[in-house]
Amino acid sequence: SFIDATLESGKVFVFYETLFSHFKDELLDTPVANVSMLCTWLQYKYEKEFYFDKEYMTRDRYIDIDIDHEVISYMREQWQVKSEDEVVKALDYLPEDSVRTAFNRNTNVLIAATRGMRFHIDKFEVSEEELNDIIFIIETTIEKFQFIGADELFDYIHQNLPQLINNNSDISELGIRKALAVLLADK
């Protein structure tokens, strides 16, 4: 069954919403018309095998499910730019809306590369020396002109730190800018 396959894959929980979505077509001709009814039926059928939480069932009573952590960990493991839909499909054992929310709200870890595409900040390759060079140019330009535009900064990076662009060749210019903004936010 889908429940057994999910649990055997190393997951210790199964969300009712995910089960309902997975079996929606099979449930059309049954009294199970919504997630709530499915939950009630599962509690009856698996009463002695599982613990039942509000949103999921598990064999471990003390489990704490953190969907943000699941999404962030997946993105880090993938080590590439991924679309929101790709992540939803890969994490089909989690509720779709929750995955989409986690994908879009963790903007300091999952960096926007283009519309609907993100990567994990750890994928961005930049050395401390490169960051210090960027900080220096920002500070000196602001000191001299009271402002530095993103285009000016990116031109400087292209001319003086081409290895930063080369090391992150699969990340768009927007993604590089956003990653730098996150890394330099506290400096």
Show which residues each predicted segment covers.
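C-terminal non-catalytic scaffold/interaction domains in large multidomain proteins
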Residues: 1-187
